[in-house]
Structure formats: C-alpha cells, structure tokens
Amino acid sequence: PRPTRPDKARRLGYKAKQGYVIYRVRVRRGGRKRPVPKGATYGKPVHHGVNQLKFARSLQSVAEERAGRHCGALRVLNSYWVGEDSTYKFFEVILIDPFHKRIRRNPDTQWITKPVHKHREMRGLTSAGRKSRGLGKGHKFHHTIGGSRRAAWRRRNTLQLHRYR
C-alpha cells in the first residue's frame, strides 16, 4: 500500500518508485512478561520479578524486526508511527528490494544492496534500533563512546599498568 504519512515516509528515505515496499505492522502494547513456567524464577529474590518488567527495545524496533523476518529478501530502511489504540501500536516499515534494478543502478540507494546490510533491523542498525543502544552525538551519549555501552564500560574498567621506560 501507499504510505499513510507520505511526508514522514519521504523524510525517512521512501521514494514512490519500484523497489520500495511499505508494510503496516501491529504490535501489542505494554511491558514484557518474563516467560517462565508458573512464575517460577530461581535464584535471589532480586531476580524474582515476572510482571512489571520493561523490554530493552522499543515497540517500533520490534515492529521493524517482525517485518524483516516476514520479508527475508527485503532490507528494512526505516519505520514510523501511524497510530495506536488501547491494545496495539501501529507502525509502517519502509522496505527495499535489494535486487531491483531501480535500486541497484541508483548510486544513492545501492549502498543497501551490499551484503553487510542484510537484516539491519536484527542488529540494531536502524534509527529505532540505535536509540535503544544509546548511540548518538553530543554530551548525552557519552556512555557509549567507543561503539557501545559494553565497549565504554570495558575501557573505563580496564586497569592499564604502563611499563616504566
């Protein structure tokens, strides 16, 4: 179908030409329940929580992942919110056919045809995925300097004893 919000879709890279696909995805709202049998979590009481847990990623990135799983041959470019009710959130995901000649022959879009961009949505490389990884520019994103939270933590917690020369 055509994008519900053509202005937003175009800002995110959509073009009304062959090779571009729009998928509307419905995601159930709310937090994430820990999938354990009868609420039986073992270990210390601090880890006994089952119900009021929050998923680390946004519902928008979940929608992108589901669209990417469903359309394995397409590449997820971006996505945007289109609506919500009490139970669901609705997102539209922009997908690109990497083998379409309109995409492959255009210098502006042929970057997504390269194999390194397979399943960007699974690896947190889309805009929505990067948000939950804490990546960005400026003083608000100092905790991911070095590529990721873990890389920044590792560098700051590694003791280096330089040999005296």
Swiss-Prot record:
Coiled coil: none annotated. It is found in: Cytoplasm. GO terms for molecular function: RNA binding; structural constituent of ribosome. One of its GO terms (cellular component) is cytosolic large ribosomal subunit. Disulfide bonds: none annotated. Residues 130-143 have a biased composition (Basic residues). Pfam families: Ribosomal_L15e (PF00827). Residues 126-147 are annotated as: Disordered. Component of the large ribosomal subunit. Component of the large ribosomal subunit. The ribosome is a large ribonucleoprotein complex responsible for the synthesis of proteins in the cell. This is Large ribosomal subunit protein eL15. The gene is RPL15.
